[in-house]
UniProtKB/Swiss-Prot annotation:
Its EC number is 1.14.-.-. The keyword Iron applies. FR901469 inhibits the activity of 1,3-beta-glucan synthase from Candida albicans and Aspergillus fumigatus. With minimal inhibitory concentrations (MICs) against Candida albicans and Aspergillus fumigatus of 0.63 ug/ml and 0.16 ug/ml, repectively, FR901469 displays greater inhibitory activity than other 1,3-beta-glucan synthase inhibitors such as, WF11899A, echinocandin B, aculeacin A, and papulacandin B. This is 2-oxoglutarate-dependent dioxygenase frbA.
Length: 337
């Protein structure tokens, strides 16, 4: 399986026919693969390089500095620095299928999370600016750039589905998205030999995820023709964006667009020697999400006449998000906010 690569410039600078074709191709790719590669997405190479530079600087800070903006042990607020092993994505493997394993595998990853600068429910957690000058200013502006692209892609999907262009983007008008920096420290291959992953198989919570990964590799996506088989998504270019469908968008479309399991393991090109050191890996992920009070059931317009909706439990986006966060941070209850 090879993830299709789409040229966003056909939409942003194309004629009406090219714009329509891009929208239809995006829908077709998301329906078949759940993932796509996106080039000419509008975030400049310089901005992406600067984001990776800040990620590297942040994670190289002494632990006591990073912990000035420490993520709480509880799920909320989902903000700030999480140390290696604090968040356990293995706890939500199979969540959408109703499979709730109690096995919480070791995951070799630390991360940083932030939300909108004006979020009244969950404030961001920042270190003093002198600890990493320019970090907060850059991250806040990069967040806005990602949000703008996210909304545009939702409009593309709606257009590709022959819906009003704001049918989906309007449901995300009050931003509750998150921007995450991930760092996977260098580790011996033997540390992944017993079933541990850099990040366990999971699907994303929200609408569309925008991802940049460095050149190390290790991202794998479940083959939709062969469930349980994971295939590598090798980075062609660190400036290329990988986008994928999240659970809420899949639910809205009654499963027409696929929210697909993915994971991060040892890069396939490395030898199988247990003594080999797997190099450190960085990724940047923007998790688009619905407005918190939006219901994330199947939308009636996607349910065939005479059929029952696949998703009809009346969860709001916030409730759905919390139901997964409570498991990843090993907490059984959390404030709904």
């Amino acid at each position: 399986m090879s993830i299709p690569s789409l040229d966003y410039r056909l939409f942003s600078h194309g004629d009406p026919a090219q714009r329509q074709q891009f929208c239809e191709d995006l829908v077709k790719t998301f329906a078949g693969y759940g993932f796509a590669k996106l080039r000419n997405h509008g975030l400049s190479d310089e901005r992406v390089d600067e984001a990776f530079s800040y990620s590297n600087k942040f994670f190289n800070l002494p632990l006591h500095i990073k912990q000035k903006a420490k993520h709480p042990e509880a799920p909320n607020p989902h903000r700030g620095y999480s140390g290696v092993g604090q968040e356990k994505i293995s706890a939500i493997t199979g969540f959408e299928k109703g499979e709730r394993s109690e096995v919480r595998a070791a995951e070799l990853r630390e991360s940083w999370d932030q939300g909108p600068a004006d979020d009244e429910l969950y404030a961001n957690r920042w270190m003093p600016d002198e600890d990493l000058p320019g970090y907060r200013s850059f991250m806040e502006s990069f967040f806005v750039e990602c949000q703008t692209l996210h909304q545009s892609l939702l409009q593309c999907i709606a257009t590709g589905l022959s819906l009003p262009s704001d049918e989906l983007s309007s449901r995300c008008a009050k931003c509750s998205a998150e921007l995450r920096l991930n760092h996977y420290p260098a580790t011996p291959a033997s540390s992944l030999a017993s079933g541990a992953c850099r990040i366990s198989p999971h699907s994303d919570f929200g609408t569309i995820t925008l991802l940049f990964q460095d050149s190390v590799g290790g991202l794998q996506v479940e083959d939709q023709q062969n469930p349980g088989v994971f295939l590598p998504v090798e980075p062609d270019d660190v400036h290329e964006m990988i986008i994928n469908v999240g659970d809420c968008l899949s639910r809205w479309t009654d499963g027409r667009l696929r929210s697909v399991n993915h994971r991060v393991v040892s890069p396939t090109r490395l030898p199988g020697d247990a003594d080999v050191m797997i190099p450190e890996r960085h990724s940047l992920a923007y998790f688009g999400k619905p407005s918190r009070d939006e219901v994330v059931d199947s939308l009636p317009l996607f349910v065939p006449e005479g059929c029952k909706p696949k998703f009809a439990d009346r969860w709001t986006a916030l409730e759905y998000n919390q139901s997964k966060l409570m498991r990843t941070y090993n907490v059984e209850t959390a404030a709904q906010g």
